[in-house]
Amino acid sequence: MKTYEDFVRIRGWAHQRNLVSGSTTDKQFLKLIEEVGELAAGLARKDDVKIMDGIGDAVVVLTILAEQLGFSIEACIEMAYDEIKDRKGRMIDGVFVKEADL
């Protein structure tokens, strides 16, 4: 599957089920937190299937949330990448800390 096509399908699925205009950003944010909780449970149990499902579900919810706000998830990802692509920093206790925060 192609990523762009996947996002198109996710948006279509969400519109067909009235999740974009029939839900609120607050509700979608709560759903995102729920999915992140499921991801955390998968990580804690080292369950690859639950981890993949949690990541995928979070991406679906983020795609819907972006659509509700009038953004495309692709534009959000591009903006985030453009912000980090030249970032410098270092690893501290397994976490990358950007130079500005050191």
Give the location of each predicted region.
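Flexible "arm" and connector segments at domain edges
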Residues: 1-55, 59-102
